[in-house]
Amino acid sequence: MTIDFVTLLHQSDSLLLFVVLAFGLLLGKVRLGNFQIGNTIGVLFTALLFGQMGFEFTATTENVGFMLFIFCVGIEAGPHFFSVFLRDGIHYITLTLVILLTALLLTVGLAKFFNLGPGMAAGILAGSLTSTPALVGAQDALRSGLLNLPHKTDMQSVLDNMGIGYALTYLVGLVGLMLVVRYLPSLARLDLSTEAQKIARERGLSDNESRKTYLPIIRAYRVGPELAAWIGGRTLRETGIYPHTGCYVERIRRNGILASPDGDAVIQEGDEIALVGYPESHEKLDVNYRNGKEVFDRNLLDLQIVTEEIVVKNDGVVGRHLVELNLTEKGCFLNRVVRSQIEMPFDRNIMLQKGDVLQISGEKQRVKLLANKIGFISIHSQTTDLVAFTTFFVLGLLIGSVSLVFGQLEFGLGNAVGLLLAGILMGYLRANHPTVGYVPPGALRLAKDLGLAVFMVSTGLKAGGGILDHLSQVGAVVLFSGMLVTTLPVLVGYLFGVWVLKMNPALLLGAITGARTCAPAMDVVNEAANSSIPALGYAGTYAVANVMLTLAGSFIIGFWF
């Protein structure tokens, strides 16, 4: 029996799709020094190679791929999209606008000057900004019929040029941004580490790394005479055991009676106390407070310690500093704060935003009470709310199909923007109502990554047939344009942030990488600053940038049509 694998690939879109995906994802795992190629580049380049070899993709799977991707982008941005308008929000929005407008106008100018056409211009913009949402927005603006194409304009040719321009400039945009944010502080004669420490002092932040061990442990001690003398009749609140040791007094046994103390309780000699704290805190406890003998008492130690992720929701907490929650008095331990999928600097003085996720450890009932005060405990479920997912998906398509007519001018959002807005709404509602629209993080990541990968396969296969011709004709010009669109908007944004917005350079560079939605570049800034402080800036611009980038893709096509 003879199997002609090449013929099978030509005959089966499904087989071709997953073969390209498999090879592309393998290529994405390749590392060149500290640089990993990544799934997007790997899949796109593999698809271009297969397209150049004559393989074609005729299925409509591409549409499902880009719609899934952009909808999931909206869900991720939703919890924090409206919170951007709080502290420093206007700075982040303005900075994002300046960077994207500079990139948009520069791309249009270069494309007009070099006569590259709308498709190549949109591809250069999306690739140089490493923004797939911009590419999705541009392609959807054409496919949705919202634009009146000039007579004899070949839509497929314009779409293919988008894919080629994106492929040629994506790597330039990624590596270029990483190099710019790495060496710009040196050129500006700035010590980014010092700047990060400066903003930390100004805002009362610290930059301690998250603990390696998140779950506290329980140990029990009998209070000896030295500790009792040191306490001297003071209450637990007055002695400040937690600030000194990191341990919290969870239970006291006195004269055989168990009690759960509050801040007004007084420890006496002979009491047996159950302390909850991280292992390193217990290790230091005897030295600091000269406790008596450690005891084993099953009833005293019978506590259920849990670690939960609490979503910030309640208006009375949003906008306040974490320290105001008085976690120590509530017997709860903060492990980390996550905002827009980015772990924030480990500090209790961070201002809380709606949708922030606090990982908290402590006794089960105490953690539950804290969650009721600030929001809700994230659902521990692997089941997706498919009813909400499909309903909001349909809503996005309906929003995208609406067109407004003003005389001879017809205006509509298109599927990309409609799905993005519907995703934002679903994500926002999820941050406010724990039972609405729950999608497990793993499922959301799968849908987003798979949708993006399928979209890249289709784009690459369709554009691959003409990539060598374009490389020989305009390859150098496209790469040159990509370098300019990568670097100049960043420089303009940096100068605007320093001179006009008066932003701290560490926060500013983090915000610039967020405006470009480029997490690898943020890692470079964090490394240069020897701090995670820049992540605050990244989270400030990331959510709104996803929306603006999608719109930018639509707008650049509108310059021509």
Curated annotation (Swiss-Prot):
Stated membrane topology is: Multi-pass membrane protein
Keyword hit for Transmembrane helix? yes
Q: For this protein, what is any one GO molecular function term?
A: monoatomic cation transmembrane transporter activity
Report keywords, A-Z: Cell membrane, Membrane, Repeat, Transmembrane, Transmembrane helix, Transport
Its localization reads:
Cell membrane
Q: Which GO terms describe its cellular component?
A: plasma membrane
- Domain (RCK C-terminal) spans 206-291, 293-376
- Cite a single GO BP annotation: potassium ion transport
Matching PROSITE patterns? RCK_C
InterPro entries in the record: AAE_transporter (IPR050144), RCK_C (IPR006037), RCK_C_sf (IPR036721), Transp_YbjL_put (IPR023017), YidE_YbjL (IPR006512)
Q: Which residues cross the membrane?
A: 8-28, 37-57, 66-86, 90-110, 161-181, 386-406, 409-429, 450-470, 476-496, 541-561
Show the Pfam families listed in the entry: Asp-Al_Ex, TrkA_C
Family to which this protein belongs: Belongs to the AAE transporter (TC 2.A.81) family. YbjL subfamily.
Per its record, how is this protein called by name? Putative transport protein ASA_2308
What is the organism of origin for this protein?
Aeromonas salmonicida (strain A449)
Tell me the classification of the organism that encodes this protein.
Bacteria, Pseudomonadati, Pseudomonadota, Gammaproteobacteria, Aeromonadales
